[in-house]
């Protein structure tokens, strides 16, 4: 147990594929509507790279936000308790820093879940069906000025040109 006054807090670690499977299993059990985007989707598409979080684009109904919240309560630190009910509507990204970090988004580069639906590929990992953004869907969110997005764009361009 961490003493609240010792200046040392809990630290998150980079997520593993096993973490993703555990998270998605909990989300699926709650009936949450979401898609995995970002680094984990890039890894699933075949680009070997590290990621510091799991990015989720979620459907924004109040009911779905509650399903996501309940699923995140299954994580060890239950860090989602610090999230306010309207945070996903108020902020571009809501970072849940539990044992590993989950970034929740209602929109990614102007795109909401309804607009993303056609670009979702369901992939089974360890018996858990996980909705990943396909390379075509990942293209738009990667149009940023970040260095790591430059590398992702080069990979996606190659993947999309091969199709």
Where are these regions (language model features)?
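Compositionally biased terminal segments of proteins
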Residues: 1-163
């Amino acid at each position: 147990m961490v003493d609240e006054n010792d200046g040392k807090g809990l630290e998150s670690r980079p997520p593993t594929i096993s973490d993703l499977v555990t998270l998605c299993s909990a989300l699926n059990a709650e009936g949450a509507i979401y898609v995995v985007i970002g680094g984990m989707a890039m890894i699933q598409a075949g680009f070997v790279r590290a990621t510091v979080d799991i990015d989720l684009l979620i459907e924004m109904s109040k009911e779905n936000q509650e399903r996501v919240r309940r699923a995140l309560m299954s994580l060890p630190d239950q860090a989602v308790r610090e999230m306010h009910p309207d945070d996903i509507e108020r902020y571009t990204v809501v970072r849940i820093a539990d044992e590993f970090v989950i970034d929740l988004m209602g929109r990614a580069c102007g795109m909401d879940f309804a607009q993303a639906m056609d670009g979702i590929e369901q992939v089974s990992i360890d018996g858990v069906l996980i909705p990943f953004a396909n390379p075509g869907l990942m293209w738009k969110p990667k149009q940023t000025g970040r260095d790591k997005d430059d590398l992702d764009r080069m990979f996606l361009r190659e993947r999309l040109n091969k199709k």
